[in-house]
């Protein structure tokens, strides 16, 4: 049996979005929608993808999806992510800690903070873009 891990994704890896096929290609399966603890901030990187950072100051909950990913596919998923995104530890609302996609601080310099939208899908929807298949917009 393959070893697997939960991976929290908050941007274009989510269901129906541009990079979601990268998760499916490695045999990942969707688990559920969730949110982070109130210690994160979110930026739009030129409206192509988000970058989420943990903060020691004022943060908020950010919407995300949890995926069950084979460990041997995790590196492939990470390597297909845009530069400046990395995998680190993400704290969920219930204080569970899972692996998740985070942005490096330099990536957010001079970019638009979108934390107030609550997540990437909400931000994209406000802009009139496609929000993928999250069970409510198919």
Language-model-detected regions and their locations in the chain:
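Glycine-aromatic micro-motifs
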Residues: 2-138
């Amino acid at each position: 049996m393959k070893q697997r891990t939960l991976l929290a994704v908050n941007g274009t890896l989510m269901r129906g979005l541009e990079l979601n096929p990268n998760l499916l290609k490695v045999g990942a399966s969707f688990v559920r929608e969730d949110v982070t603890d109130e210690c994160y901030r979110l930026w739009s990187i030129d409206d192509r993808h988000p970058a989420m950072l943990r903060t020691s100051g004022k943060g908020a909950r950010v919407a995300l999806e949890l995926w069950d990913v084979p460990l041997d596919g995790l590196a492939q998923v990470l390597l297909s992510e845009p530069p400046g995104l990395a995998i680190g530890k993400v704290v969920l609302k219930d204080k569970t800690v899972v692996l998740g996609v985070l942005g490096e601080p330099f990536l957010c310099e001079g970019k638009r903070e979108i934390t107030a939208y609550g997540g990437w899908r909400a931000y994209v929807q406000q802009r009139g873009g496609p929000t993928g298949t999250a069970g409510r917009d198919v």
